[in-house]
Regions:
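Juxtamembrane boundary at the C-terminal end of a transmembrane helix
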Residues: 231-246
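Juxtamembrane "helix-exit" motif on the non-cytosolic side of transmembrane helices
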Residues: 59, 104-115, 170-181, 238-240
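Loop-to-helix transition at the N-terminal end of transmembrane alpha-helices
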Residues: 13-16, 38-50
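Short alpha-helical packing/oligomerization segments
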Residues: 125, 173-204
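Hydrophobic transmembrane alpha-helical segments in integral membrane proteins
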Residues: 2-19
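Cytoplasmic membrane-interface regions of multi-pass membrane proteins
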Residues: 29-44, 69-96, 100, 104-118, ...
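Hydrophobic alpha-helical transmembrane segments
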Residues: 10-15, 65-67, 91, 114-123, ...
Length: 246
């Protein structure tokens, strides 16, 4: 079996473990404080992660899909959560959120392209993400409106995010003398910028939807996550039965 396929199976199994754990948390909703517990925040983060993962996966491949699901989505959920409780956006927070996303992008670049590109892309993306957080701050106040909202602030965030990450991808490819550096960088910039803008625009609807979910519905989501997690973990055991071995 090819090395990248083996790595994919291992990551799929790890994802299954994470989904199974999340499902267990949902089923223990009452034990974790009910409406005052962390599960609604987790639901929002997972929702954003699925949307980021889908957008990145369809255009940039499986590794960026995982970066979107495991890092970009939760980061946006935490940003909005901090905004909703009145927490400021200090420089330390900017570094934390920026480095989280940059690390995931660097790993995705490493696995989808090569190690040198991934290292360069991770470092340069960190500069771009932190600059975005420091200059533009947290998501706009309209995030609490309960309906999709696009204004100059949302568009500015999308353009700045897309330009900075696209430039990071172009420079990373150019440093490594890759012939398609410009094309790939423009592609990455467009995808990240458009995805960021759209997700921030629809975030008010996601926030309102999750806040109004019935408790029983959350239990149903927990059961679904447990099932999906079990299927992901089962995949590694099915392959040997089909005669496919490492």
């Amino acid at each position: 079996m090819r090395g990248d396929m083996i790595l994919f199976i291992r990551i799929l199994s790890l994802t299954g473990v994470i989904l199974g754990a999340l499902g267990g948390l949902y089923l223990a909703y009452d034990l974790l404080g009910g409406k005052n517990g962390p599960l609604r925040m987790i639901t929002k983060s997972v929702s954003y992660g699925v949307m980021f993962g889908s957008a990145y996966g369809l255009t940039l491949g499986i590794w960026f899909a995982l970066a979107g699901f495991l890092a970009s989505g939760p980061a946006l959920g935490l940003e909005i959560g901090r905004r909703n409780v009145g927490v400021a956006h200090p420089f330390v927070g900017a570094i934390g959120f920026g480095f989280l996303r940059a690390f995931s992008f660097g790993v995705a670049g490493w696995l989808s392209r090569d190690p040198q590109f991934g290292i360069n892309f991770g470092i340069l993306s960190a500069v771009g993400f932190v600059a975005s957080y420091v200059i533009l701050g947290p998501p706009p106040a309209a995030i609490n409106s309960g309906r999709p909202h696009i204004d100059k602030t949302v568009l500015k965030r999308a353009v700045f995010r897309g330009a900075s990450i696209g430039l990071a991808a172009v420079l990373s490819g150019a440093i490594h003398m890759e012939p398609d550096a410009l094309f790939y960088g423009v592609k990455v910039g467009l995808v990240t910028g458009i995805s960021s803008g759209l997700l921030v625009a629809v975030a008010p609807s996601v926030e309102a939807w999750v806040d109004n979910l019935p408790d029983r519905r959350l239990g149903g989501y927990g059961a679904i996550l447990l099932l999906i997690g079990s299927l992901c973990q089962t995949f590694q055991y099915v392959l040997p039965l089909l005669g496919i071995r490492e």
